[in-house]
């Protein structure tokens, strides 16, 4: 998570990057410091964008950055492993990530502003072309 926040610091004004919430509704916020770039930013995402990259994409989108590509993977939970006496283990979901505007990531992913598929086997990168057209 530290690396995610460090990257967010480069692009966002001071504020929430993400927050986690447990089953009881207890929230913990992760915030960026004031370090926003003045450069226009467009981010490419797809189904391989997961976990921390989704958190960053959600924070950027909620703060006005445009996303291009396909919906992200949808991995937005924190899990803990409990070892049992017989040597097996139990994995428990203990918290869920949300974007700054309260959008859940788990099983939904982050939807890009511009849905652009990039079919396998094509030489043209349609997602990159769309992103470039936004500058």
Residue ranges of predicted features:
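Extracytoplasmic/secreted envelope proteins and their assembly/folding machinery
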Residues: 1-8, 41, 53-57, 61, ...
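Gly/Ser/Thr-rich loop/hinge elements
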Residues: 1-51, 73-83, 95-98
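Gly/Pro- and small hydrophobic-enriched strand-loop and loop-to-helix capping segments
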Residues: 65-75
